[in-house]
Amino acid sequence: MTIRSPEPEVKIMVEKDPVKTSFEKWAKPGHFSRTLAKGPNTTTWIWNLHADAHDFDSHTNDLEEISRKVFSAHFGQLAVIFIWLSGMYFHGARFSNYEAWLSDPTHIKPSAQVVWPIVGQKILNGDVGGGFQGIQITSGFFQLWRASGITSELQLYTTAIGGLIFAALMLFAGWFHYHKAAPKLAWFQNVESMLNHHLAGLLGLGSLAWAGHQVHVSLPINRLLDAGVDPKEIPLPHEFILNRDLLAQLYPSFSKGLTPFFTLNWSEYSDFLTFRGGLNPVTGGLWLTDTAHHHLAIAVLFLVAGHMYRTNFGIGHSMKEILEAHKGPFTGEGHKGLYEILTTSWHAQLAINLAMLGSLTIIVAHHMYAMPPYPYLATDYATQLSLFTHHMWIGGFLVVGAAAHAAIFMVRDYDPTTQYNNLLDRVLRHRDAIISHLNWVCIFLGFHSFGLYIHNDTMSALGRPQDMFSDTAIQLQPVFAQWIQNTHALAPSLTAPNATASTSLTWGGGDLVAVGGKVALLPIPLGTADFLVHHIHAFTIHVTVLILLKGVLFARSSRLIPDKANLGFRFPCDGPGRGGTCQVSAWDHVFLGLFWMYNAISVVIFHFSWKMQSDVWGSISDQGVVTHITGGNFAQSSITINGWLRDFLWAQASQVIQSYGSSLSAYGLLFLGAHFVWAFSLMFLFSGRGYWQELIESIVWAHNKLKVAPAIQPRALSIVQGRAVGVAHYLLGGIATTWAFFLARIISVG
């Protein structure tokens, strides 16, 4: 760390009135492009309009202008999020049974949507308990609201209005910071300042504010709710905040004020900042005193982290220096040059952020069931399944997006002359070794993982169960996973002697938490069946990575097409007269990667859904006997392909197929409709552009005959557009089919 003289004076980092506000300009479609602004000659125009409207790189080469547009668009995005959130809270206030659910969360199901009987669809309003008719929701908002300390629908109303105010503020900020006071490029590139503010402000103060809310509002209200106090009798949030004695009745250390803090007797506060582990037996959620403690600790960490980087004060770390100092004995120039990449290519920056956020989202999916953070979440099986599925899909899309933007960076922003012998250059130079090894791994995993299933199917068909890979014949136990489970189950006694349980009940030990006769969580046993399907996970993930990484590493050039960078990010083939060069563009790799991402995530959510129904979820008798939803059939049924088809897909589809005439009938229609959308995609994916152009020309001829020819000439979709439409419908159809299948099933049996 070097000490240097501080900056002489504060620099002016904004430009006043750079772009005038003009509704006339915005009203003109395609105003951002000279070609598009001329208006449509052919139907291709509308496709290009949508493809390029947000491709700011194509509007201008000026990095400052691009940065401002991205910055402004972020405010627009935040406005949309606030409007969406406001809508969720408004539905909770206006159309929900939240107050009824709060009074009896084990018997009443959450609902915040009531269907209007316009053409007789009032059948969809099922009885969710407590005399309320509506659609059962599975978003987890009720559980989140209870954890936040919301006790009435009036509070939801006011929060909804607050959301709209914030949305308006964001829309104003987006306009203001583009048209009135736009930051200069140097401001966007000032990474140290940005790190300090984002770490200390967003994450540090954000966590501190949430911890404060949890301690002063959530904890006392939830403690009273857990004790069975009527929500209407509970003091309002501001009373707890303003009246310390109220809090001290529930948490005695409050009467001591800040004295223990300044005298370093922090353990005095252990009545509301705990380290218990496990779940609250009343609600089946994490102890809220544990989560308050967690957020306070996170706040401290990030407040420190937000003071680490060198700005005007000449003290602290410099990002450029850190990166350039990173040199290993075998890595050449190391990270040299990466600072310049990340401050001049927003695609490179975005690629890293998407990869990190996508991975994090998938980690969140797993924590939501292993450590259910909100009260009564763990026993709401439909919500648990929905949250897991949702976070897995989102994580998959973000990771594919990371590869997409990494490839765009390679094509548009990478300058080989400035990157010599640093890590990026070295990776690119041995890309053939990387991709061929990865390919070998994929072949190995594919044949071996699938081969184990095929072996089992064959032995099963031949009536030789003793020769199958299973827990009762030839065992393939996941010994490493079991070891990890075991060490974590035993860890608290060694590392955290005051903790009453391990971080998650899933690790093992004898603990089982049940709420209202339903299992919240118990130790999850892993066996041969899990070993088999985990290798399918490994296979699908590696193939997805192979496709995406090949797209990035060969985005600029390959042995087949050395000048690929000149062809751009997306192109159908390497021109006429050169056969066998289609589907080589970076865009095509993203397109192909999406299908394997869909494969990978589908297997994960199928595994989760069946495993939880078989080995975790179920009811518990007064004698303590657990009856699982599918009676523990996962271990013996999921070890064959036939078992997956018969005992999972077919057996569990009975609810969605038989949903007609019930309140779940919408899922039956969705199941049907989404299958259609999925099949519709194949029409785009399995036919070439020429076929359609030929058809269109014959239809246009007929129109000419009748003198009703359009002024705008109809054109078939380009090859790339056809693929985009195809993959969009494939994914939409596939995901909506899964959604209907999962929800009809779990709402019926959960």
Swiss-Prot record:
The chain crosses the membrane at residues 70-93, 156-179, 195-219, 291-309, 346-369, 385-411, 433-455, 531-549, 589-610, 664-686, 724-744. It is found in: Plastid, Chloroplast thylakoid membrane. Chlorophyll a' binds at H675. P700 is a chlorophyll a/chlorophyll a' dimer, A0 is one or more chlorophyll a, A1 is one or both phylloquinones and FX is a shared 4Fe-4S iron-sulfur center. GO terms for molecular function: 4 iron, 4 sulfur cluster binding; chlorophyll binding; electron transfer activity; magnesium ion binding; oxidoreductase activity. The keyword Membrane applies. Its EC number is 1.97.1.12. PROSITE patterns: PHOTOSYSTEM_I_PSAAB. Phylloquinone binds at W692. The keyword Lipoprotein does not apply. Chlorophyll a binds at M683, Y691. Keywords: 4Fe-4S, Chlorophyll, Chloroplast, Chromophore, Electron transport, Iron, Iron-sulfur, Magnesium, Membrane, Metal-binding, Oxidoreductase, Photosynthesis, Photosystem I, Plastid, Thylakoid, Transmembrane, Transmembrane helix, Transport. One of its GO terms (cellular component) is photosystem I. InterPro entries: PSI_PsaA (IPR006243), PSI_PsaA/B (IPR001280), PSI_PsaA/B_CS (IPR020586), PSI_PsaA/B_sf (IPR036408). It is a multi-pass membrane protein. GO terms for biological process: photosynthesis. [4Fe-4S] cluster binds at C573, C582. It comes from the Eukaryota. It holds the Pfam family PsaA_PsaB. It catalyses: reduced [plastocyanin] + hnu + oxidized [2Fe-2S]-[ferredoxin] = oxidized [plastocyanin] + reduced [2Fe-2S]-[ferredoxin]. The PsaA/B heterodimer binds the P700 chlorophyll special pair and subsequent electron acceptors. PSI consists of a core antenna complex that captures photons, and an electron transfer chain that converts photonic excitation into a charge separation. The eukaryotic PSI reaction center is composed of at least 11 subunits. PsaA and PsaB bind P700, the primary electron donor of photosystem I (PSI), as well as the electron acceptors A0, A1 and FX. PSI is a plastocyanin-ferredoxin oxidoreductase, converting photonic excitation into a charge separation, which transfers an electron from the donor P700 chlorophyll pair to the spectroscopically characterized acceptors A0, A1, FX, FA and FB in turn. Oxidized P700 is reduced on the lumenal side of the thylakoid membrane by plastocyanin. Belongs to the PsaA/PsaB family. PANTHER family: OUTER MEMBRANE PROTEIN, OMPA-RELATED, PHOTOSYSTEM I P700 CHLOROPHYLL A APOPROTEIN A1-RELATED. This is Photosystem I P700 chlorophyll a apoprotein A1. The lineage of its organism: Eukaryota, Viridiplantae, Streptophyta, Embryophyta, Bryophyta.
